[in-house]
Swiss-Prot record:
CDD domains referenced in this protein's UniProt entry, alphabetically: lectin_legume_LecRK_Arcelin_ConA
Provenance organism: Canavalia gladiata (Sword bean)
Pfam families recorded: Lectin_legB (PF00139)
Residues annotated for a carbohydrate binding in this entry: D119, R139, L262, Y263
UniProt keyword Flavoprotein, yes or no: no
Complex and partners: Homotetramer.
Residues annotated as binding Mn(2+): E171, D173, D182, H187
Domain of life, source organism: Eukaryota
Role according to the record: Glucose/D-mannose/rhamnose specific lectin. Has hemagglutinating activity towards rabbit erythrocytes. Has mitogenic activity towards murine splenocytes that is inhibited by glucose. Inhibits HIV-1 reverse transcriptase with an IC(50) of 35 uM. Has a potent antiproliferative activity against L1210 leukemia cells in vitro that is not inhibited by glucose. Inhibits translation in cell-free rabbit reticulocyte system with an IC(50) of 2.08 uM. Lacks anti-fungal activity against M.arachidicola, B.cenera and F.oxysporum.
Residues annotated for Ca(2+) binding in this entry: D119, D173, Y175, N177, D182
Protein name per the record: Concanavalin-A
PTM (free text): The mature chain consists of residues 164-281 followed by 30-148. To form a mature chain the precursor undergoes further post-translational modification after removal of the signal sequence; cleavage after Asn at positions Asn-148, Asn-163, and Asn-281 is followed by transposition and ligation (By formation of a new peptide bond) of residues 164-281 and 30-148.
């Protein structure tokens, strides 16, 4: 069937208008295949059906995701924990020993009236039925159980304390808890099955400023890398080599988590995107994107 000249002009114009409206209205999108997953949230609606919200996490306030509790006037509250997980599982490895590469980015706003903001935000990967551990407010970032609730009979099992069998995380830690191995300054860190980070880097957290976290796993080099940056050029970078198939189950979920304790801060997520693919070496190492 022939297409008129008027119709041929209309199609590209219509396509442009549609794409423009998607950008203006910040429409989220996702694609899901057996061995690949992509999603992008440019804003969060009040009824965000493709997220699993846990604890104090809420969506819809100014189009943002609030991971921890805030008052009606937006003030942060203490002793809060919340998480958001994408609903679809991720195929992170398969029996042929092929492991997925992935790329995650989120923008965030941490704001605190306290002289010591606490406690931070983490991007994490865990088993598909993951839930918030008991006692994981404050320094444990909603990811790891507290020593006081891990007990063997009446004795605390310190080997199990602060550990989780199926957690890989990149933490943006705003408050140094040196008693659990933190360096004595705000930092970013890579956590493998424990809140005691395998690798850390000093982070100049900017109170009330929007920052960006970019996380990459290159399955060819088995390197997990992260960069946290601000518009003024300040950044922190950390990397650690890990075989994800030795740490995580074959199918996982990805999420964002945050907590407050005695000190407090808002833990606001403005956008979040994620892409993973098995048998892919197309996702670059962090050094090529910074």
């Amino acid at each position: 069937m022939a297409i008129s000249k008027k119709s041929s002009l209309f199609l590209p114009i219509f396509t442009f208008i549609t794409m423009f409206l998607m950008v203006v209205n910040k429409v989220s999108s996702s694609t899901h295949e057996t061995n690949a997953l992509h999603f992008m949230f440019n804003q969060f609606s009040k009824d965000q059906k493709d997220l699993i919200l846990q604890g104090d996490a809420t969506t819809g306030t100014d189009g943002n995701l609030e991971l921890t509790r805030v008052s009606s006037n937006g003030s942060p509250q203490g002793s809060s924990v919340g998480r958001a997980l994408f609903y679809a599982p991720v195929h992170i490895w398969e029996s042929s020993a092929v492991v997925a590469s992935f790329d995650a980015t989120f923008t965030f706003l941490i704001k605190s009236p306290d002289s010591h903001p606490a406690d931070g935000i983490a991007f994490f990967i865990s088993n598909i039925d993951s839930s918030i551990p008991s006692g994981s407010t404050g320094r444990l970032l909603g990811l790891f159980p507290d020593a006081n609730v891990i007990r063997n009979s009446t004795t605390i099992d310190f080997n199990a304390a602060y550990n989780a069998d199926t957690i890989v995380a990149v933490e943006l830690d705003t408050y140094p808890n040196t008693d659990i191995g933190d360096p004595n300054y705000p930092h970013i860190g890579i956590d493998i099955k424990s809140v005691r980070s395998k690798k850390t880097a000093k982070w100049n957290m900017q109170n009330g400023k929007v920052g960006t976290a970019h996380i990459i796993y290159n399955s060819v080099g088995k390197r997990l890398s992260a960069v946290v940056s601000y518009p003024n050029g300040d950044s922190a970078t950390v990397s650690y080599d890990v075989d994800l198939d030795n740490v995580l189950p074959e199918w996982v979920r990805v999420g964002l988590s945050a907590s407050t304790g005695l000190y407090k801060e808002t833990n606001t997520i403005l956008s979040w995107s994620f892409t993973s693919k098995l048998k892919s070496n197309e996702i670059p190492d962090i050094a090529t994107v910074v």
